[in-house]
Design a protein with these regions (language model features):
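Surface-exposed acidic/polar loop and edge beta-strand patches at domain peripheries
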Residues: 27-158, 164-170, 177-179
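Short, Lys/Arg-enriched N-terminal segments with co-localized hydrophobic residues
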Residues: 1, 5-7, 15-32
């Protein structure tokens, strides 16, 4: 199951399943990855800074609703797809008269480290900002914010894309949760 949104300024997705915050640090394959856990009385979610990805949705009984990954098939849980959903023909696209974009399937966000901007027991905001490395692939001054907010029986996920540049910035955004 995947959902995609193209050229949107803000999108929201709700997952529902029938107050506590924790932050842990893991070092996986050279990445310094931070996990954030959000909890209320009915649901808990785990988020990781690598890719700003949701990695677990559990109800109060501990039932897991999100695919936990299997490298033999697919190791992801719910990657964020940005600035493209799917792939580009021949891996590149020219936008306007001179902007060339080049990246693999589903863009670049899922493989980059996000910064935890703010958090509480039931809400976390992760941010990915353009830098010299991202501009080599996607030549725009962007910021992607992932906002995760617990509801009574689920999690509300908001994608906020900010264009810090002065030219139009085409993009697609999507989520790829597996259940």
């Amino acid at each position: 199951y995947a959902f995609n949104y193209c050229f949107s300024q803000e999108t929201q997705v709700f997952f529902n399943v029938n107050s506590w915050y924790n932050d842990t640090i893991l070092n996986l394959g050279g990445y310094l990855m931070s996990n954030t856990i959000l909890r209320n009385e009915n649901v808990s979610v785990t988020l990781k800074s690598l890719g700003g990805e949701l990695t677990s949705i559990k109800d109060a009984s501990g039932t897991e609703y999100l695919w936990q990954g299997n490298p033999d098939f697919w190791s992801g849980q719910a990657p964020v797809l940005f600035p493209i959903v799917g792939c580009l023909r021949n891996g590149t696209a020219t936008i306007g008269n001179s902007k060339t974009c080049s990246f693999g399937r589903h863009g670049l966000a899922r493989k980059l480290e996000f910064t935890l901007v703010s958090s509480s027991e039931t809400c976390a905001v992760y941010s990915l900002k353009a830098d010299d490395s991202t501009k080599e692939q996607y030549p725009y001054d962007f910021e992607l914010q992932m906002i995760y907010e617990l509801t009574d029986h689920g999690v509300k996920i908001s994608h906020k894309v900010i264009n810090h540049g002065d030219i139009v910035m085409p993009y697609c955004i999507g989520g790829h949760p597996a259940f």
